[in-house]
Amino acid sequence: MAKGIREKIRLVSSAGTGHFYTTDKNKRNMPGKFEIKKYDPVVRQHVVYKEAKIK
């Protein structure tokens, strides 16, 4: 079987709270690091989440 082009990633909060979301991304369309603004329930604000590897 062929290997899929979607890779599981972890979005880690830049607020330093330790909160994270998991998602997947298309490696072919988005080869760079992924950044998105999402809600962090620990600080109760929208902050930038940055891509990190799932261990």
Swiss-Prot record:
One of its GO terms (molecular function) is structural constituent of ribosome. GO terms for cellular component: cytosolic large ribosomal subunit. InterPro entries: Ribosomal_bL33, Ribosomal_bL33_CS, Ribosomal_bL33_sf, Ribosomal_zn-bd. Belongs to the bacterial ribosomal protein bL33 family. This is Large ribosomal subunit protein bL33. Pfam families: Ribosomal_L33. The keyword Lipid biosynthesis does not apply. GO terms for biological process: translation. It comes from Vibrio cholerae serotype O1 (strain ATCC 39315 / El Tor Inaba N16961). HAMAP family: Ribosomal_bL33. Keywords: Ribonucleoprotein, Ribosomal protein.
